[in-house]
Structures are given as C-alpha cells and as structure tokens.
C-alpha cells in the first residue's frame, strides 16, 4: 500500500469472584470491553476465479462488550448442586465489502443452567444453554434467533461396571 496501515486498541476487563465455602455458594462476575480503530481495510474481490486482496485506506472502528454472571449453590446433605450462568454480548463495527463500507451489529443473551444430583447409587446431570441473538447488517435487521441445547446424563455403577445413558437435544433456528 501507499500508506502505513495501523490499528489502535483500547481494552478493559473487570472480574470479581465470591466464595462462601461453608454455605456452598460461589459466584463470579466479569465485564470486558474492547474498542479498535484502524486506518485500513482489506478489500477482497473475486476476478476470473482468483481472489484479489488489496489494502484500502479507510478509517474503521469496532466495539465489543461482554458481561457474564455465574453462580453456584450446593446442598451437601442432599447430594445436589445447582448453577446458572448469564452472558450478554454486544458487538458493532464496520467492514469493507465490494468497495463499500457496511455497518454491522450483533447482540446475544445466553442462559446456562446446570443441575447435578449424586446419591450413592447414581450420578444425574442436566446442562442447558439457551441463546437469543439479533443481528443487523448494512442497516437491515436480520431475523432474531433462539437456539438451545440441553443434555441429560444418568450414570450408575452396578458392581464394577459403570452404565451411562445420555441424551442431547439441539434446537437451532436457521
């Protein structure tokens, strides 16, 4: 290129952990942010079946935010443990496509519950992940998506043999 490409970045991160071992309660919280500025973009075009990639001088920026809260509570006498995580994500920025600068935005919210029960005769585990997301590209809003994944596992030991039964269910909106 006829110019010197450069990128600047500003990053922030905060984490807090809380432990109350006697009460079997644990939690953590994290927040991160990132902002990037660049004076160049990569323009990719396909000509005669070949990829042509060129640097173009153009100021662009992007922002990423991520927050997460997780907690866990155990019940030792009952051989039971619960936990749940909540994650929120936001991203926006610009990309260069076919000689045009196009803006984008993405948001998502994730809920991740978990249950574990472990009496002397078995181990039962449930894990879920439920994600709601929304995107827009070039000022056009795309369809919201609600995807989830759930798993259930049962394990039992009979004499010296572990028997395990697992089920996994996916739901993806395309």
Model feature map: region roles:
Residues 1-174:
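Exposed, low-structure sequence patches enriched in small/polar residues
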């Amino acid at each position: 290129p006829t110019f010197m490409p450069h990128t600047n970045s500003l990053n922030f991160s905060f984490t807090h952990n809380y432990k109350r071992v006697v009460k079997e309660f644990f939690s953590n919280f994290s927040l991160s942010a990132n902002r990037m500025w660049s004076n160049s973009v990569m323009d990719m075009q396909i000509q005669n079946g070949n990829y042509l990639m060129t640097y173009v001088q153009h100021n662009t920026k992007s922002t990423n935010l991520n927050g997460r809260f997780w907690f866990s509570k155990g019940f030792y006498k009952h051989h039971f443990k619960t936990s749940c995580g909540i994650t929120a994500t936001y991203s926006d920025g610009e990309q260069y496509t076919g000689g045009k600068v196009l803006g984008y935005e993405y948001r998502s919210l994730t809920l991740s519950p978990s249950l574990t029960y472990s009496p002397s005769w078995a181990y039962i585990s449930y894990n879920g992940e439920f994600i709601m997301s929304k995107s827009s590209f070039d000022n056009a809003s795309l369809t919201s998506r609600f995807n989830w994944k759930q798993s259930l596992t049962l394990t039992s030991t009979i004499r010296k043999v572990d028997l395990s039964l697992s089920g996994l269910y996916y739901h993806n909106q395309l």
